[in-house]
Curated annotation (Swiss-Prot):
Residues the record marks as active site: 186 (proton acceptor)
Protein name: Glycerol-3-phosphate dehydrogenase [NAD(P)+]
Superkingdom of the source species: Bacteria
Binding site for sn-glycerol 3-phosphate: 103, 131, 133, 186, 242, 252-254
Residues holding NADPH: 11, 30, 103, 135, 253, 279, 281
Single GO BP term: carbohydrate metabolic process
Natural source organism: Wolbachia pipientis subsp. Culex pipiens (strain wPip)
GO molecular function, a single term: glycerol-3-phosphate dehydrogenase [NAD(P)+] activity
Enzyme Commission number(s) of this protein: 1.1.1.94
Gene Ontology cellular component list: cytosol
UniProt cross-references to InterPro entries, sorted A to Z: 6-PGluconate_DH-like_C_sf (IPR008927), 6PGD_dom2 (IPR013328), G3P_DH_NAD-dep (IPR006168), G3P_DH_NAD-dep_C (IPR006109), G3P_DH_NAD-dep_N (IPR011128), NAD(P)-bd_dom_sf (IPR036291)
Location in or out of the cell: Cytoplasm
Length: 325
């Protein structure tokens, strides 16, 4: 089986490295500088000391990345629709499975990644890949667990069998929507935890994570209906596991971003964002989650507080007052 990974950021490259031990992998990027750097050094600047094996073929033209059995989309959520249209223009075969490895909510439509893909590529089978997984640890082939969500059980079992390795434990789920809600919101809550980090102790930090779970459940319930909420999703690796690691580890880009915003000495969140080199998915998701909560008429005070901090320049003091009370 040939697997294509679209997106050569830290996460996409880490996935390619992780899967390349026993498989041929295509790694696609539209960034010529990244393409040339990886081709020359066989290493990503974002993943130092993590060599990229010869089993990984790096491509610059997307047409060269569609001849695969499985395509893993590890692109920023706000670029997902555009990439899917490019795949459609390449006459992507209908039997090619799409695995989503991106997290967030599309700002312009308030749709989850699977909803975007189903609009543009309705004939391709779809799965979602999510869980607690820092790119650097994945690239170093350290042990980790993930959830693969797929509504087609036969396809899901086949993908789990193909992707699971000695250091990767995959759990199969059919809860495509719930997994994505958890994956998107945890980045917003990580920013919130970064804001309070250093100002208060571990007790307040734990309370904030606990309240975050309540907001995840609220949006999850609004999307699927109260009777369809799966407790295994909420307590599994893709929700509780991912939330805990993203909200507590300094390797978390969103947590670090929240801390920088809280200690910015007057710089706006947009200024801090522009100075960084990494994608902060929680920044975009904060607005999308706030807008979606308004649309669905549910209360999400943590998301609202982070949205107002990032987009309306609410003071840190007022934001923290909401987060800790």
């Amino acid at each position: 089986m040939v697997i294509s990974v679209l997106g050569a950021g830290a996460w996409g490259t880490a996935i390619a490295i992780s899967l390349s031990g026993k498989k041929n992998v295509i790694l696609w990027t539209r960034n010529k500088a990244i393409f040339e750097s990886i081709k020359e050094k066989r290493e990503s600047d974002k993943l130092p000391d993590c060599p990229i094996s010869d089993n990984v073929s790096v491509k610059l033209a997307i047409e060269d990345a569609v001849n695969a059995s499985v395509i893993i989309l590890a692109v920023p959520t706000q670029s997902l629709r555009e990439i899917c249209h490019q795949l459609n223009d390449c006459n992507l075969k209908k039997n090619v499975a799409i695995i989503l490895a991106c997290k967030g909510i599309e700002k312009s439509t308030l749709k989850l990644p699977s909803e975007v893909v189903n609009e543009v590529l309705p004939n391709n089978p779809l799965a979602v890949f999510s869980g607690p997984s820092f790119a650097i640890e994945v690239a170093r082939k350290l042990p980790y667990s993930m959830v693969l969500a797929c509504q087609n059980e036969v396809l899901g079992l086949k993908l789990v069998s193909e992707l699971q390795q000695e250091n990767i434990k995959l759990y199969l789920s059919s809860d495509v929507i719930g997994i994505q809600v958890c994956a998107a919101l945890k980045n917003v809550f990580a920013i919130a935890c970064g804001v309070v980090l250093g100002r208060f102790g571990f007790n307040a930090h734990a309370a904030l994570i606990t309240k975050s779970m309540s907001e995840i459940k609220a949006l999850y319930s609004a999307k699927v209906g109260d009777g369809n909420v799966d407790i295994n999703t909420l307590l599994g690796p893709a929700c509780l596991g991912d939330l805990v690691v993203t909200c507590t580890s300094l390797n978390s880009r969103n947590l670090s971003f929240g801390s920088k915003v809280a200690n910015s000495n007057g710089s706006s969140a947009q200024q801090i964002l522009s100075e960084g080199k990494s994608v902060i998915e929680g920044f975009n998701t904060a607005k999308s989650a706030f807008d979606l909560a308004e649309k669905l008429k549910i209360k999400m005070p943590i998301c609202e507080a982070i949205y107002r901090l990032l987009y309306e320049n609410t003071s840190i003091e007022d934001t923290i007052s909401v987060l800790v009370n």
